[in-house]
From Swiss-Prot:
Implicated in the level of global muscle contraction and cardiac function. Phosphorylates a specific serine in the N-terminus of a myosin light chain. GO terms for biological process: cardiac muscle tissue morphogenesis; muscle contraction; neuromuscular synaptic transmission; positive regulation of fast-twitch skeletal muscle fiber contraction; positive regulation of gene expression; regulation of MAPK cascade; regulation of muscle filament sliding; regulation of neuronal synaptic plasticity. Belongs to the protein kinase superfamily. CAMK Ser/Thr protein kinase family. This is Myosin light chain kinase 2, skeletal/cardiac muscle. The modification Phosphoserine is found at residues 160, 166, 168. The keyword S-adenosyl-L-methionine does not apply. ATP binds at residues 305-313, 328. It catalyses: L-seryl-[myosin light chain] + ATP = O-phospho-L-seryl-[myosin light chain] + ADP + H(+); L-threonyl-[myosin light chain] + ATP = O-phospho-L-threonyl-[myosin light chain] + ADP + H(+). The active site is at residue 420.
Length: 610
């Protein structure tokens, strides 16, 4: 051990083996016969004094003075008071050299050899000063022994730090590991290693052999730097040779995931363009039957979902299964009302598609007919997109329109025309996604291309010119309505809406519409081309549902979603449109009530016998 206690122990050993010096006449035995060689404690433990003696001989010029060579014929006065090797640097790894790196002849045992790769020039020169004492030294044996013990103690105290600077010392390696372990958490990464391979220990470069017998200051620095570089190289190489799987800690992983999620949301919103889920029940063929509604279903009339001139829609629950459904209650006022319901049931029995609402059951009572259908909780499409928390972009419109086209294509393949496509009849599957379904087949008709079909009903804003003129209709009639819906989703404006129904119908007949420059400024040319090929007076010039799905605007949604991160102005204008529509309905109701009140107060009804 390179400790102070070890140095003192070696010094004590030297005292026990030292013999009194010879007299002035030179009588004495040769050093190789009578006096055992002492271990070079100064060489092993470090320099004894840091002060440089200017009178010391130059070791480079005379590395091994003749007076220091140990020969059997050398008289006692010519050798120094304590036998020691001439130079510390003459000892190689194998103990070769003039002074001898191994134990001296007649020694008590092999002394401990401590490496000293970082000896400085001052230490080497001072070592020569301490060992090359002149032959004329007249100090007594006791004085030399005390001086030797003091030098050994001081060498032990100064030799230990020099030993710790060795790059191959376990103490310095442990110190380096502690330094790495004490680094702040911000500079290190907490890792869990799986399958770490063993790393070979760094090899000791060993003490360097100096040709001149001593190390200069520059040589000492270069040697120390080389040893430290070798140490760093070994530590650096071990990290490259280790094959491991780094797993960040839970906190770092969560933080990184949150950062990635925040960056993604800043770039674009993830759109769900998957098909909507099917109905919670398989498609079935429904027939109108009589029965007791209250025994099979629990009606919740307070939870109204909508209504119209045919009746109201509320939620209900099937008692036997607990399935939540939507119940459409239709009043039977005339025989024609029942015929319309039977036609609606016939149409819905043929529509088994994810984007089309499904029929579950139909029950007739004495005063009404109730259709039990799939419950869709998301609400109307327009009610959803006017929400302040919803960010509407052109890509959102693409996703909505594509699903509507899918539903229309299936209907047309089944020879069914909806004839009442409008925003109120497009429902969202939920309140957060982009999945929609088409509802309300009360005005739907079976279509035969070989037969003429005319209708005179619908919502004025979405009616096609052929319906207004009471001309023959076709599957292209629904495509006109799709063009109007798309126009409104992109701009928030109704292209044909007038101050009243008459003005609206006149705008439809003349196909008087245009792209508002300010509103459509951020809309792509592909979207405008899509709308222009639908809102055209000539039926044969309109795109079919299949052609719409093949249009460039409804394709490559993934690439367009990356480029489109704007919020369309239509979201703001649609809100104004809905407010105006509600105000108009309320105004009509109030006006009708006021007219009825005036007629009643004037006595006109009494004159008519009412």
């Amino acid at each position: 051990m390179a400790t102070e206690n070890g140095a003192v122990e070696l010094g004590t050993q030297s005292l026990s083996t030292d013999h009194p010096p010879t007299d002035a006449a030179g009588d004495g035995s040769p050093a190789s016969e009578k006096e055992p060689s002492l271990p070079d404690t100064e060489k092993d433990l470090g320099p004894t004094n840091t002060k440089k003696d200017p009178g010391a001989p130059d070791p480079k010029k005379n590395p091994d003075p003749p007076s220091l060579k140990k020969t059997p014929e050398a008289p006692g006065p010519e050798k120094k008071g304590d036998s020691a090797p001439a130079s510390a640097s003459n000892q190689g790894p194998s103990g070769e050299g003039d002074g001898g790196g191994g134990p001296a002849e007649g020694g008590t045992g092999p002394p401990a050899v401590l490496p000293q790769p970082t000896a400085t020039a001052d230490a080497s020169i001072q070592k020569l000063d301490a060992t090359q004492a002149p032959s004329g030294n007249q100090e007594s044996g006791e004085a030399k022994a005390g001086k030797k013990a003091a030098e050994c103690r001081e060498a032990g105290r100064r030799g230990s730090p020099a030993f710790l600077h060795s790059p191959s010392c376990p103490a310095i390696i442990s110190c380096s590991e502690k330094t790495l372990a004490m680094k702040p958490l911000s500079e290190t990464t907490e890792l869990i290693f799986a399958g770490v391979s063993e790393t070979p220990d760094p090899q000791d470069p060993g003490p360097a052999k100096d040709e001149g017998g001593t190390n200069t200051l520059a040589d000492g620095k270069e040697e120390a730097e080389a040893g430290q570089a070798e140490q760093a190289k070994v530590q650096g190489d071990t990290s490259q040779r280790i094959g491991f799987q780094a797993v960040p800690s839970e906190r770092a992983e969560v933080g990184q995931a949150l950062c990635l999620t925040a960056k993604e949301e800043d770039c674009f919103q993830i759109l769900d363009d998957c098909p909507p889920p099917p109905a919670p029940f398989p498609h079935r063929i429904v027939e109108l039957r009589t029965g007791n509604v209250s025994s099979e279903f629990s009606m919740n009339s307070k939870e109204a979902l909508g209504g119209g001139k045919f009746g109201a829609v509320c939620t209900c629950t099937e008692r036997s299964t607990g399935l939540k459904l939507a119940a459409k209650v239709i009043k039977k006022q005339t025989p024609k009302d029942k015929e319309m319901v039977l036609l609606e049931i016939e149409v819905m029995n043929q529509l088994n598609h994810r984007n089309l609402i499904q029929l579950y059951s139909a029950i007739e009572t004495s005063h009404e007919i109730i259709l039990f259908m799939e419950y869709i909780e998301g609400g109307e499409l327009f009610e959803r997109i006017v929400d302040e928390d919803y960010q509407l972009t052109e890509v959102d419109t693409m996703v909505f329109v594509r699903q509507i086209c899918d539903g229309i294509l299936f209907m047309h393949k089944m020879r069914v025309l909806h004839l009442d496509l409008k925003p109120e009849n497009i429902l969202c599957v939920n309140t957060t996604g982009h999945l929609v379904k088409i509802i309300d087949f009360g005005l739907a008709r079976r279509y035969n291309p070989n037969e003429k079909l005319k209708v005179n009903f619908g919502t004025p804003e979405f009616l096609s010119p052929e319906v207004v003129n009471y001309d023959q209709i076709s599957d292209k009639t629904d495509m006109w309505s799709l063009g109007v819906i798309t126009y409104m989703l992109l701009s928030g404006l109704s292209p044909f809406l007038g101050d009243d129904d008459t003005e609206t119908l006149n705008n439809v007949l003349s196909a008087n519409w245009y792209f508002d420059e300010e509103t459509f400024e951020a809309v792509s040319d592909e979207a405008k081309d899509f709308v222009s090929n639908l809102i055209t007076k000539d039926q044969s010039a309109r795109m079919s549902a299949e052609q719409c799905l093949a249009h460039p605007w409804l394709n490559n949604l993934a690439e367009k979603a990356k480029r489109c991160n704007r919020r369309l102005k239509s979201q703001i204008l649609l809100k104004k449109y809905l407010m105006k529509r509600r105000w108009k309905k309320n105004f009509i109701a109030v006006s009708a009530a006021n007219r009825f009140k005036k007629i009643s107060s004037s006595g006109a009804l009494m004159a008519l016998g009412v």
